[in-house]
Amino acid sequence: MGVTYVEGVLTGPTGKHATVRFWVDSGATYTLVPHDVSKTLDLAPKRTVAFTLADGTTIERAVSECHLALPEGEGHTPVILGEAGDEALLGVVTLEIFGLILHPFERTLEPMRMLLA
C-alpha cells in the first residue's frame, strides 16, 4: 500500500492563503487543516463534530469551511480544524465535491464517474 500526497492552496474568508501538502486519505471523511494553517487563514469554527479514529477512540474537533485549489480543480469544502500534531489530510468528502477518486493502483487523483440519482 502506498501513500499519496497532493499540494493544494487553501484560502480563508479574509483572502489569506496557504499552500499545504495533503496526505490523500480515502479512509478519512473530512479534510483536515493543520492548526497553524487554520490560524493563518483566520478559519472560525462553525460546529464541533465527534470523529472515530482507526483504533476506535473518539475525538472532537471543530469544523469550518474554506476554498481549496488543487491541480485537478477548486471549490469550497468543509475542513476539520486540526490541533497540534495533526497532519494535513484530504478526505473523501472533498474528493467527492471535486468529482475525484484516488486510483488504487496508480495512486493518483482522477475524475470520478458522476451519478445524477
Which residues does each PLM region occupy?
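Pepsin/retropepsin-fold aspartyl endopeptidases
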Residues: M1-A117
